[in-house]
């Protein structure tokens, strides 16, 4: 495992209020998606009917991004209204879809290490079988926190 040094989502998104919903793994997924869209020369118009297939990890290492729980109770002073969004597996896909203008099928796959590959396979099948003409597929996860 190698650390990701100096990762700053703002470099990819600029001012972007949805950033507060993302855990580190979801931020990596969003950055990768934006890189893929820009690198592929795709526009929001081209992606409007595209599908989105995102693989995510199981969030087993919740690091310091989630409220401290002691004796089955959350420390209320550390809980903000949106904390649950950083834990839900489909938050990354939702934010990617909004950022890229994708309004087609949206699927989140949570099969641990194989999640991104499973997402890519699902996108391939949808295109091969004629359900979609275009899809963005991949994943993101993080087991380490800075």
Model-inferred region functions:
Residues 1-42, 85, 89-103:
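A glycine- and small-residue-enriched flexible loop/hinge segment at structural boundaries
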């Amino acid at each position: 495992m190698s650390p990701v040094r100096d990762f700053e989502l703002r470099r990819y998104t600029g001012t972007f209020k949805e950033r507060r919903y993302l855990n580190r793994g979801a931020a990596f997924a969003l950055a990768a998606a934006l890189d893929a869209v820009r690198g592929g020369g795709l526009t929001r118009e081209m992606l409007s009917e595209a599908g989105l297939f995102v693989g995510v990890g199981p969030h087993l290492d919740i690091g310091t991004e989630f409220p401290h729980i002691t004796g089955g109770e959350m420390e209320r002073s550390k809980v903000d209204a949106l904390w649950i969004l950083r834990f839900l597996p489909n938050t990354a896909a939702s934010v990617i879809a909004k950022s890229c203008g994708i309004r087609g099928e949206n699927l989140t796959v949570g099969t641990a290490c194989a999640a991104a590959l499973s997402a890519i396979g699902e996108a391939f099948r949808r295109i091969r079988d004629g359900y979609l003409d275009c899809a963005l597929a991949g994943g993101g996860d993080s087991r380490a926190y800075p």
